[in-house]
Amino acid sequence: MVLFTDLQSQNGGHCQPLLYLKSIPVAQFELGTFDYLNTLIASHAIPCDWKVVGGVHPIKTRALLIAVKERLQRIATRDPALAAKVQILESHEELKQLRVEGAMGAIYQPNAAKCWPYKLVAWILERLVRDDARAATGEKLFNLQTSTSALGLQRLEDGYWIVHTSRGQITTKQVLLATNAYTSYLLPRMTGLIVPVRGQVSALVTPDKGEQLQHSYAWLDNEGGEDYLIHRDNGPLILGGERLVADGAEVGVSRDDAVDAAVAESLRRALYGTLKLKEPDQEEDDELAADFEWTGIMGYSKDDSPWVGAVPESLGGGGGLWISAGYTGHGMPVAARTGISVAQMMMGREKQEGAVAVPEEYKISETRIRNLEGKAERTLVEELKMLDRP
């Protein structure tokens, strides 16, 4: 088996299931992935700064607040335990305690964590290399090839695949594409189904007399914008988002070797008037200094759901080609278990007891592909109203 992956560096270390913004099966899957990561990291003492802190979603408008309340009522009728994991806070004292006094209200979810994603991935890769070297048989099963570009795929008549790379060719029965934003380079027929979108993150210097934030934050607006924030313990504020201020909102941008100046400035100013960083009697800074600014390329799915499973011939696949990609900037509470699920499919173990089943929305089908033709964009309020409707 050959795995090709896009390890993108934009990730800001914000892991939180969107329990009220997804269908119930998807919310349950994301919560399961969060619990899986929490257990994995704790059981192996993985040094990746993982800390469960609870997540706050400030709500800016009355219309969005009403839509969220109605959505939670519908969830409660079908899955009361899931609905109980989401709290709506509206009182001035509650919002002040969360440092978002100017908000119309706020969502609080205890199931949210911050971490250093690179450290987590590096630990896993190091463990795979180490365990492979210690294998009793002496046979190497894991081969890590970094800085090796996949240039093309070729299917042979006997069912094998040839992967053309910058270092030669590989012939294999099965290929897994974890290529996310760059999927259409190898599968041109998926152009438009997964689109590259550049995200930008800043490590902002905690201001003088700034206090340690106790929670992570995410701001979602009706126009499709999303900002997300974690505060490293005794370190910088890691803020990502603000891409809507860039020309074209960074949609279709696949280069991560530059930062957008307008986005960078907006990130430095974004928290002013939005989040209280200092002690109550201290005046806030209208702009923060940035120690580091960087970008990474996200894979946005046309219907906001990942693509997981066997790639059909209509998309350039056939027997032996698999995919897990298209996380729409929300891979942290998703990708770990979609990866497990597709690996089980490849080994024919998807029906065994304990196998990880992905939601129907993630599965690849001709019906899903057809339904995306001419799909209209929806606002966040419209999306909330549509979820779980009969």
Segment roles from a protein language model:
Residues 1:
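N-terminal Rossmann-like FAD-binding beta1-loop-alpha1 element of flavoenzymes
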Residues 74, 78, 100-173:
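Helical element adjacent to the flavin cofactor pocket in flavoenzyme catalytic cores
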Residues 4-29:
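Glycine-rich active-site loop/strand segments that organize a redox cofactor
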Residues 149-237:
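Flavin-dependent oxidoreductases
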Residues 85-90, 143-145, 289-293:
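General small-molecule cofactor/ligand-binding pocket signal
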Residues 148, 157, 161, 304-307, ...:
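C-terminal lid/capping helical subdomain adjacent to the catalytic/cofactor pocket in oxidative enzymes
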Residues 189, 193, 210-320:
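Active-site lid/adjacent beta-loop-alpha segment flanking the redox-cofactor pocket in flavoenzymes
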Residues 22-127:
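Rossmann-like flavin
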